[in-house]
A protein has these predicted regions:
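Canonical hydrophobic alpha-helical transmembrane segment
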Residues: 167, 192-216
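Short, intrinsically disordered, charge-rich cytosolic tails of integral membrane proteins
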Residues: 218-245
Length: 245
C-alpha cells in the first residue's frame, strides 16, 4: 500500500516534494498500529502546497486540514469509516519535521525505547478507547521526553570531543609559548603571537564547550528521570488485569 501511495504522491507533488517518508507505528516492526499509514511529505516551503492543492481537492478520496499549530497540513485519504492514509505535509526545515523523523529513527534503532513505546500505546489504547485527546496527550509526553533525552545524549559526545581537542590545543600552544627555543627574533615573536592566540581561543572554546556539556548533561538527566517515571508507571499498569497483554 505504501509503495503505491508513494508513487501517487510523487506524481501529485512533483518537484515541490524534497522527501517523502513512511512514519508512524506502521513504519516500525513490532508496534501495534491502526490500519492507517502515516506519511510525511517534506517541502522546501509549506506555502508550495498551494501549487498542488487542487490535485487533492479535485479527488474525492482526499480531504485537507490545515494544522498551523503543528506547522503542517494534514491530507487524509479515505472516508471516516475507511481511512487509509494520513499525509503530513511539512516544511523540511521545521522543528516539527526534524522531530518526526528523529523519533522514527530512534524507534528503529533503540530496541528498549521501542518496547517501552509499544507498552505505552497498548495501555493508552485500553485506558482511553474513546478519548482521543487524553490518548494523544499522554503519547506526546512520552515522545517529547524521549526526543529530549536522546538528543541531549547524542549531542553530548561530540561536544566533549570538541572540549578535549580545544584543551589539547591550548596545552600545545602554552608549551610552544614558553618552551620552544628560537634564535631568530622574528620567528620567536611569530611563534609567541600564534601561541598566544592558540591559548586564548583554545581556552574560550574549552570553557564554552564545558558549560554546554553541563547544560546538556542536566537536560539529559531531567529527561531520563521523567522517562523512567513514565516507564515505571507503564510497568505498574501492565500488572493490572484490565491492561495485561
Amino acid at each position: 500500500m505504501f509503495a503505491q501511495e508513494l508513487e501517487e504522491l510523487w506524481d501529485y507533488f512533483g518537484d515541490y516534494a524534497i522527501r517523502i517518508s513512511h512514519i508512524g507505528s506502521t513504519a516500525i516492526d513490532g508496534l501495534e498500529a491502526k490500519p492507517i499509514i502515516d506519511i510525511v511529505v517534506a517541502l522546501k516551503d509549506l506555502d508550495d502546497f498551494d501549487n498542488v492543492s487542487h490535485k487533492f481537492t479535485s479527488n474525492p478520496e482526499y480531504s485537507i486540514k490545515k494544522d498551523f499549530d503543528n506547522d503542517e497540513i494534514l491530507v487524509r485519504k479515505g472516508g471516516e469509516r475507511n481511512r487509509k492514509f494520513y499525509i503530513h505535509v511539512m516544511d523540511i526545515d521545521s522543528k516539527r519535521y526534524r522531530d518526526v523523523i528523529f523519533f522514527r529513527d530512534t524507534l528503529l534503532h533503540e530496541e528498549e525505547i521501542r518496547n517501552d513505546y509499544r507498552d505505552l500505546k497498548h495501555i493508552l489504547a485500553k485506558k482511553y478507547p474513546h478519548n482521543r485527546k487524553q490518548y494523544t496527550a499522554h503519547k506526546a509526553d512520552f515522545i517529547e521526553t524521549t526526543l529530549d533525552m536522546v538528543w541531549a545524549k547524542t549531542t553530548l559526545g561530540p561536544i566533549l570531543v570538541i572540549a578535549g581537542v580545544s584543551l589539547i590545543t591550548s596545552i600545545i600552544a602554552l608549551w610552544a609559548r614558553f618552551s620552544v627555543p628560537y634564535s631568530a627574533e622574528f620567528y620567536r615573536l611569530r611563534v609567541r603571537d600564534i601561541s598566544r592566540a592558540g591559548i586564548f581561543f583554545g581556552g574560550v572554546i574549552f570553557l564554552t564547550t564545558i558549560l554546554a556539556s553541563v547544560v546538556l548533561w542536566w537536560r539529559y538527566h531531567n529527561a531520563k528521570k521523567h522517562y523512567k517515571e513514565i516507564v515505571a508507571k507503564n510497568k505498574k499498569e501492565l500488572t493490572k488485569g484490565q491492561y495485561k497483554k
